[in-house]
C-alpha cells in the first residue's frame, strides 16, 4: 500500500480523548488498565491511523503565514466538496450556494430542528441510536420517539416501515433524523429502502435530517446512496450533513458541512445557526478539508476501506470461533461492530458492566452499548492497525470471554 496503516502511533499527551481519558469520565470512558497492560482504544469513534499527508501539508502551509484574521471561505473549499461528492457519490447539480459550513454534524441537527419544530415536539430516530443524537436532541428540548431496527433472517438490520408509519402518525411527528450509513449498526442502506422511507416521510410531511458523516467508510460490495438522490421530493425536504472529520480522522479540527437544495429550508436553517455565531468556520479547518479532498485523499480512503475490511473480517471471524454466545450483524460500512452479548451474559451469570470492566482492566477499551439502546451490547472500534486488533482479540479471549 502507498499509505501507512500499520504503524502504532503514540497519542498520549497529544489531545486524545481515546487514550488520555481512561478512568476520567465515569460512565463513558473505560477504567484505567491494570499495570502491565497498555491501552488499546476501541471506543471513541476516531481512528488510530495517521491522516492523509496532504491535510498536514495544507495546514502547515497556511499556518506559516503569521496572520489569522477574519476571512471568507475560499472558492476552492466549495470546489473540492462539489468534486468529492460527484466522484464519490455520483452527486449531480451541486452548487456552492447549496453548501454551508456546520460546526459539527450535531449542531446541524439541532439547528434544523429549531427551524422546524417546537421544544417538546417528537422527533423520530431509529434505534439502536447514536448516543450523540440522544444527548443533543433531548438537551435541545425535543422528545425522541424510537423506531427499532429489526434483524432479518440473514442477520441484516432492516427498517420497520410499518412501525415508522405508526409512530409518525400516533405522535404527530414532522421531523426525522436518519443515519446513513447507520451508526452503530454499520448498515449501508439500499436505494429501495431509502426510497420507501422517504415516501413515508413525504406522506407525513417530515423534514428529514440525514447524517451521512460515515458515507466515505463503505466496505467492498456496498455503495452509499445519498438520501437526497432518490427522488426530487427527497432532494427538497432533506438536510444532508457531511464532514471530512470521520473519513480523515479530523474530529479535533471540527468542520462539517450541510447540503440543502431547497432555498426556503436552507434559509430557515441558516437563520437559526447564524443567530448565535457558533457556526463560524475555522480557517485551519477549511484548509484541512481542502487538503483532504485532494487526489491523494481519494487514494487514501480507498486504501483505508481495504484495511478496515480486513480488520472487520479478522475480528468477526475471531468472535465466531472464540466467543460463543456473542452475536453481531457484520457491518457494511463504518468501522464499528455492535456486539450483542446477551446470550453470553446469561450463560455465564455476568452482566454487560462486568464485560466492560474486565476488558478495560486488560487494556481493551471498548464502549458500553446501552446508551446506544443496545441493552447488552458493546460497540467496538476497529480503526486501528491489524496488529492491535489481534492483540485485543487475544486479551479478550484469555482474560475476559474465556477466562479460567
Predicted regions and their residues:
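Hydrophobic residues in well-ordered beta-strands that form the structural core
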Residues: 125, 146, 210, 366-368
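Conserved core of the PLP fold type I
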Residues: 68-199, 216-217, 221-229, 233, ...
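A short helix->loop->beta-strand "cap" motif at the edges of active sites that frequently abuts
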Residues: 142, 203-206, 235-236
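PLP-dependent aminotransferase class I/II
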Residues: 237-321, 327-331
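N-terminal small-domain helix-loop-helix segment of the aminotransferase-like
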Residues: 2-104, 111, 295, 403-404
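Conserved PLP-binding catalytic core of the aspartate aminotransferase-like
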Residues: 308-309, 322-361, 378
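PLP-dependent enzyme catalytic core of the Aspartate aminotransferase-like
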Residues: 347-350, 357-404
